[in-house]
């Protein structure tokens, strides 16, 4: 950046500050080594959405996606870390240059380091930018489910039923109580004269959150709409032309699943288990082993990993 650039002064002060911190930390490291102390650093899998990295090299990231985690006993709706996910195809095309430079810089200060969420090098839980809850995510990369897998098991693939929020009068009452009529009149419309559908301004959790923040809906309506939006069985894989899908995590607890007939439940259960616990292992191994060995060779540090 040239000194004549409009942002030069604002950026240069950070260069100066970081360089001084670099010198101070190196001095501390040198002293620690004379005392026989080994230093261990820490590097998280993700970077802040508004970081210098995403500003300088946005092509290395999926800025329209968010990293997070699926539901567990501590977070029933999953986690949304709001960090962009990596565009590994672009990163790999540069021989992992950005990641190698990160490790090499860390080696100026540390003898060993921990990769926080090392599983992210194999796969990441990815949530579309327009959604808020981790439950709206899926594993990326992953081998999806195909329409043929449902049909070969005797289930006719009903796109509307399986991929759109399942909404009934009973569900509206459970979610909204006395505000159910208001939701029915303001947030929904009838498709084909019988199926409730969300109006366009209520299709995403992020849009609903904005309406709540603007004081246009109550907190109960916000959370109820979040639950309606997530009451689906499948997420369509982008650009798959309606042929590939990710199963919604924890679908068996949903009213949309409970409304299936028994043969449909069996097939959805089988395919969900197949997707989450069987078909990905070899694929994820190959995904991780394309990245980690190359990155390990970038420095002499001892690498530790945590899930």
Regions found by a protein language model. Give the residues of each.
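Catalytic cores of glycan-processing enzymes that make or break glycosidic bonds
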Residues: 1-307
């Amino acid at each position: 950046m040239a000194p004549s650039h409009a942002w030069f002064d604002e950026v240069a002060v950070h260069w100066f500050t970081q360089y001084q911190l670099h010198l101070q930390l190196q001095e501390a490291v040198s002293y620690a080594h004379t005392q026989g102390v080994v230093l261990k650093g820490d590097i998280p899998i993700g970077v802040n959405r508004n970081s210098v990295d995403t500003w300088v090299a946005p092509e290395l990231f999926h800025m329209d996606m968010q990293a997070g985690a699926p539901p567990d006993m501590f977070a029933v709706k999953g986690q949304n870390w709001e960090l962009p996910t990596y565009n590994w195809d672009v990163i790999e095309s540069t021989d992992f240059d950005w990641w190698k430079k990160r490790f090499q810089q860390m080696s100026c200060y540390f003898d060993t380091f921990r990769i926080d969420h090392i599983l992210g090098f194999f796969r990441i839980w990815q949530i579309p930018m327009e959604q808020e809850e981790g439950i709206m995510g899926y594993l990326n990369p992953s081998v999806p489910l195909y329409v043929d897998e449902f049909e070969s098991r005797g289930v006719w693939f009903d796109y509307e039923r399986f991929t759109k929020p399942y909404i009934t009068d009973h569900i509206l009452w459970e979610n909204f109580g006395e505000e159910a009529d208001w939701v029915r009149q303001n947030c929904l419309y009838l498709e084909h004269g019988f199926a409730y559908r969300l109006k366009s301004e209520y299709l995403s959790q992020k849009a609903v959150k904005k309406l709540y923040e603007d004081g246009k809906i109550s907190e109960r309506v916000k959370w109820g709409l979040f639950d309606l939006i997530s009451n689906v069985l499948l997420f369509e894989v982008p650009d798959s032309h309606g042929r590939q899908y990710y199963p919604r995590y924890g679908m068996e607890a949903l009213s949309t699943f409970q409304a299936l007939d028994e043969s449909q439940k069996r097939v959805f259960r089988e395919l969900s288990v197949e997707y989450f616990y069987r078909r990905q292992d070899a694929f994820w191994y190959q995904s991780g082993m394309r990245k980690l060995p190359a990155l390990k060779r970038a420095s002499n540090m001892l690498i530790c990993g945590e899930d």
